[in-house]
Design a protein with these regions (language model features):
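Acidic (Asp/Glu)-rich catalytic clusters
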Residues: 67-74, 101-109, 179, 216-218, ...
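Aromatic-lined carbohydrate-binding surfaces of glycoside hydrolases
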Residues: 44-207, 214-216, 222-241, 257-259, ...
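Bacterial N-terminal signal peptides that target proteins for export
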Residues: 1-8
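Substrate-binding cleft of secreted/luminal carbohydrate-active enzymes
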Residues: 29, 114, 118, 255-353
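Mature N-terminal, pre-catalytic/accessory segment of carbohydrate-active enzymes
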Residues: 22-53
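Hydrophobic h-region of N-terminal signal peptides that target proteins for export
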Residues: 12-21
Length: 353
């Protein structure tokens, strides 16, 4: 074989390998696309099992009063979002009054409180951090985050800023001192953010998340701790895997912080290739959690317009439960109190036995 022929054969092999790689990657990204089909036969009633079910209230805590969850045997309690701003009205001065009220109210019905600590918002009119952080000393404390269409989407606490993070750690310590062992658990908000800060670093952000996780665990050695780890800026799985999200899951398992995610979307590729894949593929001793949030009851995310809210739909609650239990091996499920779906789909499907 001549030199020219050898070169041609080598080029052909390289081209074939490259083409195989191109066809393999799409298949990897589709590997769980039909996983939900196994659970299409799931039906009501959803029986009592090992999953701890909580009803989620997104900063509308007053709705727990006389709520149906209080008398329902399937629900262990309420997950309520509290903003950093509410809990620390002034620097170093904490006010946990609403936490105590909610904890005691739930306790009177033999239910438990699960705290979600808010430092990120999806509303440009509201910042979840105390006013003192919005100063030059903390570089403004927050930055704008943007939606996929480049429109402003809310505000993100500068988790990657050491001075901001130090204050967050002090808040966790104060919370843990009073509530560790008294509440069911506490979780940090999702890791997914859409920022354009000139000083933002992907690597520093991952380090910051891990530091917050460690602070959380040290502050709450007894109650369940959890972080909603769904996406990390700068990588997109499975093709562009820089180890960011994977590292968060490994670290959580290492230090004893539970791992979870918002938005149980069983048909959405993004969710299937990130948080849901991490849960399905890993072996964990820490608790796993998944949230059914606004829109998820009809396969959407975020706020749903009135037309969709009022349209006829088929309940997917049995499917979501079966998928979470078998495919994800979940320990905690957080069902948002979204009308009309919580009453029409969840309450009617959950067994009272």
């Amino acid at each position: 074989m001549s030199t020219v022929e050898k070169c041609f054969m080598l080029l052909l092999v390289l081209l074939t390998t490259a083409l195989q790689g191109q066809t393999t990657e799409p298949k990897r990204s589709e590997r769980y696309a039909k996983a939900y089909e196994k659970y299409l036969g799931a039906s009501c009633p959803v029986p009592k099992d090992s999953i701890q079910h909580f009803v989620y209230f997104a900063r509308d805590r007053e709705l727990i009063k006389d709520h149906p969850l209080l008398s329902h045997p399937m629900f262990k309690g309420a997950q309520i979002m509290y903003s950093w701003r509410e809990l620390e009205p002034e620097k170093g001065k904490y006010d946990f009054t609403i936490l105590r009220e909610d904890m005691e109210y739930l306790k009177s019905y033999r239910k438990r409180l699960f705290i979600q600590l808010q430092d990120v918002t999806f509303n440009i009119k509201y910042k979840a951090v105390p006013d003192y952080l919005l100063t030059e000393e903390y570089d403004g404390g927050v930055v704008m985050q943007y939606n996929d269409d480049d429109s402003p989407g809310g505000w993100v606490a500068q988790r990657w800023n050491k001075t901001v993070r130090a204050q967050f750690s002090l808040l966790l310590q104060a919370l843990g001192k009073e509530f560790d062992g008294k509440i069911e658990g506490i979780n940090l908000q999702e890791t997914s953010i859409g920022v354009r800060d000139s000083v933002f670093s992907e690597l520093e952000y991952v380090v910051a998340l891990k530091e917050n996780m460690l602070s959380l665990k040290k502050s709450f050695p007894t109650s369940t701790t959890m972080i909603y780890a769904n996406f990390i800026p700068g990588e997109w799985l499975p093709g562009d895997d820089k180890g960011y999200l994977r590292g968060i899951y490994q670290y959580g398992e290492q230090i004893g912080v539970g791992l979870g995610g918002p938005d149980l979307m069983v048909k959405r590729k993004g969710q299937l290739n990130h948080a849901l894949a991490m849960m399905h593929e890993g072996q964990y001793t820490v608790p796993l959690g998944i949230a059914v949030q606004d829109g998820n009851y009809i396969g959407e995310t975020g706020d749903i317009d009135n037309e969709k809210k009022n349209s006829t739909h088929h309940s997917i609650v049995p499917l979501l439960h079966a998928f979470a239990k078998d495919f994800l091996k979940i320990n905690y499920m957080f069902w948002v109190d979204q009308e009309p779906y919580f009453k029409t789909d969840v309450l009617t499907c959950f067994s009272r036995e």
